Swiss-Prot record:
Monooxygenase; part of the gene cluster that mediates the biosynthesis of the tetrahydroxanthone dimer secalonic acid D. The pathway begins with the synthesis of atrochrysone thioester by the polyketide synthase AacuL. The atrochrysone carboxyl ACP thioesterase AacuM then breaks the thioester bond and releases the atrochrysone carboxylic acid from AacuL. Atrochrysone carboxylic acid is decarboxylated by the decarboxylase AacuI, and oxidized by the anthrone oxygenase AacuG to yield emodin. Emodin is then reduced to emodin hydroquinone by a yet unidentified oxidoreductase. The gene is AacuP. Its EC number is 1.-.-.-. Pathway: Secondary metabolite biosynthesis. It comes from the Eukaryota. Belongs to the avfA family. One of its GO terms (molecular function) is monooxygenase activity. This is Monooxygenase AacuP. Keywords: Monooxygenase, Oxidoreductase. The keyword Cell membrane does not apply.
């Protein structure tokens, strides 16, 4: 039986607020310990990320993308299915140019409804095709410095 809609909604709002706040602790606050984050499309071949991997990745990413802004355009919540989808645009500054990405972010709630236990996120493929190589080169340069 799904968790009450009000509980799921509070968790969904906590997830969005954490994303908007753009701090590792805030963003991860709604994630369950076993939460998995999957990059879409599946054909991108990016392996799922565990919470433990994300806890290491986010501080690095969040220090690179500054002046982060989240604009949510649509949220659809299906309490009976314990899931929701968020369509949003994010912008930020980076050392190698502006960041502007579109996201379709699908989230699933655990049995209690108090945590997100799965995330599948579709990014703007056109933007990411140009941005990811710059991001990877920047991170590599920082690690070598």
């Amino acid at each position: 039986m799904p968790a009450p809609a009000a509980t799921q909604t509070a968790t969904l709002n906590k997830f969005i607020d954490g994303w908007k706040g753009w701090t590792p602790d805030g963003f991860l606050a709604s994630w369950s310990d076993d939460c998995a984050q999957v990059t879409l499309p599946f054909s991108s071949g990016v392996p799922p990320r565990t919470r433990a991997i994300t806890e290491k990745l986010f501080p690095k990413l969040m220090s690179i993308l500054t002046n982060f802004q989240l604009t949510v355009h649509n949220v659809i919540h299906e309490p009976a299915e314990s899931k929701a989808v968020i369509y949003a645009i994010t912008t930020a500054d980076s050392p190698f140019g502006p960041y502007k990405n579109e996201h379709a972010c699908f989230v699933w709630f655990d049995e209690s409804g108090e945590s997100v236990n799965r995330i599948e996120e579709m990014f703007d493929g056109v933007f990411m095709k140009g941005f990811l190589p710059k991001l990877e080169a920047y991170i590599k340069g920082q690690e070598e410095a």
